[in-house]
């Protein structure tokens, strides 16, 4: 679930309506054009080439990691590299076993089915998915009561690509049915800088390398955020500058948007200040913290915390969340001696 404040943040890593058109236009079509995630790219390249040489479908693939790192893009690339169709859906959208059956029976041989947020799939639907993934068949119950009978439908061989931000919530039987598992990590500043330069070329936005670097530093390791910031800074450059994005133009634009040098904004600051001021630096439990800042616990856990953990600003322990010395330093607050 996405919180209200997160929906309105320019640096949220979750998908916003404004992202759809720009992401489609900027999305790479091949693994060669896909920047970053080198280990996952190498693995997928080998497995795709092997499957194509044997004229087989690719093994089922699980992509996991924080939102905005390119899981949907990778699924699209895999289908493109395999030369097959891509069908996209999500865990919450498949409410009943019949919904899944309708999707699976309409696939062609070797097609790719991409299920986003697969950790949110209904358990009864998941049980129907097991034989579909393993034996490429569908068990359907016809009728009710004593006259009910089961029939087995053969399915075309297909590749399921599941994407999740919470791999730990997948059941073991489901996780075990994925032959290829790829963890997507936050991008480096250098990788994001290259992505910004590539995107600016496609969008016909004039940008200097130091301007791209400034955007990359504030993009929270996430390409989706980098592209969104580029779009906003391009507008700023056209109105307030000569249309060229330099490091100064990027800094001025992002300061106006409330994005600091590390990519943090008012929501991050509120979360950190709540831990530091209300709870003396922690530890504080997740539910208590969520109530204190008026946010959903899942939004805190999935959207806010991962980047703060990456920066070393907070720590998650058995007793709750604790603000670390780096957070105090960034907020220019003296670190208490007793800690």
Swiss-Prot record:
ATP binds at residues 26-27, 68, 71-73, 134-136, 177, 187, 224. It catalyses: ATP + H2O = ADP + phosphate + H(+). Keywords: ATP-binding, Cytoplasm, DNA damage, DNA recombination, DNA repair, DNA-binding, Hydrolase, Nucleotide-binding. Homohexamer. Forms an RuvA(8)-RuvB(12)-Holliday junction (HJ) complex. HJ DNA is sandwiched between 2 RuvA tetramers; dsDNA enters through RuvA and exits via RuvB. An RuvB hexamer assembles on each DNA strand where it exits the tetramer. Each RuvB hexamer is contacted by two RuvA subunits (via domain III) on 2 adjacent RuvB subunits; this complex drives branch migration. In the full resolvosome a probable DNA-RuvA(4)-RuvB(12)-RuvC(2) complex forms which resolves the HJ. It is an enzyme of class 3 (hydrolase). One of its GO terms (cellular component) is cytoplasm. Pfam families: AAA_lid_4 (PF17864), RuvB_C (PF05491), RuvB_N (PF05496). DNA binds at residues 297, 316, 321. Belongs to the RuvB family. This is Holliday junction branch migration complex subunit RuvB. Residues 1-187 are annotated as: Large ATPase domain (RuvB-L). Gene3D superfamilies: 1.10.8.60, P-loop containing nucleotide triphosphate hydrolases, Winged helix-like DNA-binding domain superfamily/Winged helix DNA-binding domain. Has 3 domains, the large (RuvB-L) and small ATPase (RuvB-S) domains and the C-terminal head (RuvB-H) domain. The head domain binds DNA, while the ATPase domains jointly bind ATP, ADP or are empty depending on the state of the subunit in the translocation cycle. During a single DNA translocation step the structure of each domain remains the same, but their relative positions change. GO terms for molecular function: ATP binding; ATP hydrolysis activity; four-way junction DNA binding; four-way junction helicase activity.
């Amino acid at each position: 679930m996405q919180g209200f404040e997160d929906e309105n943040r320019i640096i949220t890593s979750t998908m916003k309506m404004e992202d759809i058109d720009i992401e489609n236009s900027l999305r790479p079509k091949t693994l060669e054009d896909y920047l970053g995630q080198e280990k996952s790219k190498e693995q997928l390249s080998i497995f795709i080439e092997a499957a194509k040489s044997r004229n087989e479908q690719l093994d089922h693939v699980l992509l996991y990691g924080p939102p905005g790192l390119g899981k949907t893009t990778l699924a699209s690339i895999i289908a493109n590299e395999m030369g097959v169709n891509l069908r996209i859906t999500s865990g919450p959208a498949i409410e009943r076993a019949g919904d899944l059956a309708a999707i699976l029976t309409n696939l062609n041989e070797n097609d790719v089915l991409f299920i986003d947020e697969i950790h949110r799939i209904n358990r009864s639907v998941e049980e129907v998915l097991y034989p579909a993934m393993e034996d490429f068949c569908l068990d359907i119950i016809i009728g009710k009561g004593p006259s009910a009978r089961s029939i087995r439908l053969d399915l075309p061989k297909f590749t399921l690509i599941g994407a999740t931000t919470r791999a730990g919530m997948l059941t073991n039987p489901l996780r075990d049915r994925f032959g290829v598992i790829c963890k997507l990590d936050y991008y480096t500043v250098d990788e994001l800088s290259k992505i910004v330069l590539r995107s600016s070329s496609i969008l016909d936005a004039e940008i200097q390398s130091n301007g791209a670097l400034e955007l990359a530093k504030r993009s929270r390791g996430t390409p989706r955020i980098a592209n969104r910031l580029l779009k906003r800074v391009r507008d700023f450059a056209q109105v307030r500058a000569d249309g060229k994005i330099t490091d100064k133009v990027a800094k001025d634009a992002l300061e106006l948007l409330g994005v600091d040098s590390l990519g943090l904004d008012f929501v991050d600051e509120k979360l950190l200040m709540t831990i530091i001021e209300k709870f003396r630096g922690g530890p504080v439990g997740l539910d208590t913290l969520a109530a204190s800042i008026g946010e959903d616990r899942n939004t805190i856990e999935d959207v806010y915390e991962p980047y703060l953990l990456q920066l070393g600003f907070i720590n998650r322990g058995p007793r709750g969340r604790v603000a670390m010395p780096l957070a105090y330093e960034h907020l220019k607050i003296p670190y208490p001696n007793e800690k």
